[in-house]
Amino acid sequence: MIVSAMEKAEILVEALPYIKDFYGRRVVIKYGGAAMTDCELKQKVMQDIVLMKFVGMHPIVVHGGGPEINQMLSRLGIQSEFVNGFRVTDAATMEIVEMVLGGKVNKEIVAGIHASGGKAVGISGKDGMLIQAHPADGSGKMGFVGEVQYVNPELIEKVIENGYIPVIAPIGIGEDQQSYNINADLVAAAIAVSMKADKLVLLTDVPGLMMNPADSNSLISVLKVSEVENYVQEGIIAGGMVPKVQCCVEAVTGGVGRTHIIDGRVPHSILLEIFTDEGIGTMVVNE
């Protein structure tokens, strides 16, 4: 028991310089993957976020919700079609997406943060014209899939100023008041740039970027922007990792200090990344 207590003390001491460095800083967390569907992991993510707030950081949560959307569409007998990883979103699907993300998933995260001792406010990108969007596809084949045109940080600033953690659903609004379904990674990157965040953390279902996915020891701990193009050509950055790396590149070239792709299946992965010397996952830097 004495050893255990000493180990806990050492962990706190190791975290001290990071707590000092990130006091008052903004960290955008893209919350998705297994960490949203596994109850134990979900609770640990909520605890991580609340702890960050209590040690003086300003976490900003952007969430996905693909599995929940799939469940609701299936229940209603609506089939989903995907093109290059994006859900084709017609009017009926858009209505369901907005309902599930803004009305169900968002509020569950807010409730989870409150249950862990924190204070949160759930908002959609439509609130306060937070995320202004336009169609991602000019041909119209993707329906109401959107791209971020502009982020208005005023509402997020007000939420933070009043001591709350912003929890943001990735729904945008167009000039014609049309709702748009936007990839949560893209929204997180755009918000990180707009808020001049020090970190962007993407929770995924993989350890990070792997030189060889079949080799668990081939994790690329640091990825430089200058290396990305070659890695794409070599097939090292492929599949679902392509848009995540692109989001990280957009963020760090837009002024965000560091971006991280980490394994949300690891308990307390956010704390391990931010408050330990070793960190986890892949850090993308503008070098």
From Swiss-Prot:
Enzyme Commission number(s) of this protein: 2.7.2.8
Stated family: Belongs to the acetylglutamate kinase family. ArgB subfamily.
Pathway annotation from the record: Amino-acid biosynthesis; L-arginine biosynthesis; N(2)-acetyl-L-ornithine from L-glutamate: step 2/4
Record site: Transition state stabilizer: 30, 244
GO molecular function, one term: acetylglutamate kinase activity
Function, in words: Catalyzes the ATP-dependent phosphorylation of N-acetyl-L-glutamate.
InterPro entries: AceGlu_kinase-like_sf, AcgluKinase_fam, ArgB, Asp/Glu/Uridylate_kinase, Glu/AcGlu_kinase, NAGK-C
Residue ranges that the Swiss-Prot or TrEMBL entry lists as coiled coil: none
Keywords, comma-separated and alphabetical: Amino-acid biosynthesis, Arginine biosynthesis, ATP-binding, Cytoplasm, Kinase, Nucleotide-binding, Transferase
Protein name in the entry: Acetylglutamate kinase
